[in-house]
Regions:
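Active-site flanking loop/helix segments enriched in acidic
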Residues: 3-27, 59-70
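Divalent metal-dependent phosphate-bond-processing catalytic cores, especially two-metal-ion Mg2+/Mn2+ enzymes
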Residues: 13-26, 30-42, 55, 92, ...
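An active-site-proximal "capping" alpha-helix that borders the catalytic cofactor pocket
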Residues: 28-31, 73-89
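Short helix-capping and hinge/turn segments at secondary-structure transitions, especially at repeat
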Residues: 37, 60-63, 84-92, 105, ...
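Acidic/histidine metal-binding catalytic segments
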Residues: 41-49, 90-104, 117
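His-Asp-centered metal-binding catalytic motifs of divalent-metal-dependent phosphohydrolases/nucleases
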Residues: 46-68, 79, 101-108, 125
Length: 193
C-alpha cells in the first residue's frame, strides 16, 4: 500500500463521522491531481501536492476544539502540526512533511504563492469551495481572474461554472473562414487559385 493511500485512509479515519469534510478533501485531491498532471509538474512535486490535498484542512477540528470556530487563518495556524504528526506516523520523508506543512499553513493565503504545488492546491480548493458554498458566478469569475494561473484550473472553472463562454456555434469554422474571406476582399486582396 502506498504512503498516499495510507494517508487517504488515515484522513478518512481522522474525519470519521464528518462526511462533508471527507467529501471535501477527496474532491480537492481529485482536482489537484488532475491539474498537476495536466500541467506536467514533476513526480516529486505531484506527490507533495497530493499529500497536501488530503490534509489541507486538517486544522479544522483542532481549531473548533480550541476556539469554537474554524476560519481559514485558524486552519492555517492549527493544521501544520497535525499534518506533521500524521505524516511522521505514516513514514513520509521529512522534506515532504516540511513542504506539506508549509502548504497546509498557507492554503488560505493567496499572496506570494511560491510553487506549482501551492498554486494548484489553492485552485483545487477554490474549485470545490465554489460548488460547496454555492458561490455567485460573478464572485467565481473575479477570483478565477485574480488567483488562478494554470491553464487547466482556468479551463475547469470556466467549463464548470460558465460554460457559455466556451460554446461555439455548429458552423464556427465556416463562420471564421467567411469572416477571413470578407476581410481579404475588403482589403482589396485577391488570391489566385
Amino acid at each position: 500500500m502506498s504512503r498516499l493511500n495510507n494517508l487517504y485512509k488515515k484522513m478518512i479515519e481522522y474525519d470519521r463521522g464528518d462526511p462533508k469534510r471527507i467529501q471535501h478533501f477527496v474532491k480537492v485531491h481529485s482536482f489537484a491531481r488532475l491539474i498537476g498532471q495536466e500541467e506536467y509538474i514533476d513526480d516529486h512535486t505531484l506527490y507533495i501536492l497530493e499529500a497536501a490535498a488530503y490534509v489541507h484542512d486538517i486544522g479544522i477540528h483542532p481549531a473548533m476544539e480550541k476556539y469554537g470556530r474554524d476560519d481559514g487563518k485558524l486552519q492555517e495556524q492549527e493544521g501544520p502540526a497535525e499534518a506533521e504528526k500524521m505524516m511522521k506516523q505514516l513514514g513520509f520523508e521529512q522534506d515532504v512533511i516540511d513542504r506539506v506543512s508549509y502548504l497546509v499553513g498557507h492554503h488560505h493565503t493567496y499572496t506570494n504563492i511560491d510553487g506549482m504545488d501551492y498554486q494548484i492546491l489553492v485552485e483545487a480548493d477554490f474549485l470545490v469551495n465554489y460548488f460547496e458554498n454555492h458561490s455567485e458566478t460573478d464572485t467565481i469569475k473575479k477570483s478565477v481572474k485574480k488567483i488562478f494561473k494554470t491553464e487547466t484550473g482556468i479551463r475547469i472553472a470556466t467549463e464548470m461554472f460558465f460554460p457559455e463562454e466556451f460554446q461555439m456555434s455548429e458552423t464556427w469554422a465556416q463562420d471564421g473562414l467567411q469572416e477571413l474571406d470578407d476581410f481579404i476582399e475588403a482589403q482589396g486582396i485577391y488570391i489566385r487559385q
